[in-house]
Amino acid sequence: MRRSRDRAGGSHIAHRDHRSVARHPRRRRGGRSGGNRVRHGRAARRRPRHGRGRARRVARRGRDAGRDRGALPRRGRARRWSSRPSARQRRGPAEAEVAAAAGAEGVGLFRTEFCFLDRVDAPSVDEQVAAYRGVLAAFPGRRVVVRTLDAGSDKPLPFANADAEQNPALGVRGLRIARRSPALLDGQLRALAIAAEAESALVDVMAPMVATVDEARDFAASARSVGLTSVGVMIETPSAALLASEMLEVVDFVSLGTNDLAQYTLAADRQLAELGELNDPWQPAVLRLIGAVGDAGRARDLPVGVCGEAAADPALAPVLVGLGVTSLSMTPRALGRVAAALEAVTEAQCRAAAEAVRKAATAADARAAAAAVLAPR
């Protein structure tokens, strides 16, 4: 299996006097060594100030904008971009090819539940291997962050969610399905390990709906037992966000699912349009939780990603960078807009904007505070 010394889902820091992305090895858990050499994407180049006009032109080209790989805040950190194609058995490879053509550095969220939907029984290991290989093949030598089955709630499965739940959003969903049907997770992890062995993509695997350190530890042990070496968890609940430092003691990276994080933090069903103003990643409580996770990642020098809709917001992306986020996952069409937004600001502005929003009392205040700091000078 191809193994990576520098783990998943993240951009790599390039200081202002570096012309290429830093390639320092990161420590492995449990004494695991790196194995094969990491195959990086194109190195990020430092851009002069006159590059702003080019960034705007690139952004207008839509999905082709992603061809300019190393978008970065000026005199600051290199950012790598990940796309988020759905992992449908039939459409997965085609969507992955679209993302690759759009210039994505990899896949920041490979949704595997689409292999399981519209079925009366679980897919076999062989069926899953074929589906996963179709996506991995589109990103040779690049990172693909795979989320294990996230069914339940709005995506119930007849062979996993046996009982109707009065409140499925708080019920048996995500990793919790493994309690009821452990064979589902075991088979999926085996299939991912086989697919990763057969392809050259750098595979990272993460579990959704993790709330406790025990859950993170158990998942990491299961994934590593089949040979998957880069293991993470989703941060979608306030519990996981508050325990981010402890989570990062047992996993290699974390990825913030801002859609669910907002829903659970504000106690507002994200399916209800009338509560839309509460399900807003600009809500100060959500931003402070993101900041706490970013602080934990910085303290341990481990990757922190965002794969919710917040990552595709050009106004919010610099704030997320300032809060400590190291990778952003978005649809291919959003790549250019977000890249252009980051190219227009400095790392210092990102950090200042993050500090400003942490002091905000309302979502409107947070937007205004960030805009004031990030306004063109």
What are the language-model segments listed below?
Residues 69-377:
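Conserved alpha/beta-domain cores
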Residues 1-104:
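Acidic, glycine-rich flexible loop/linker segments
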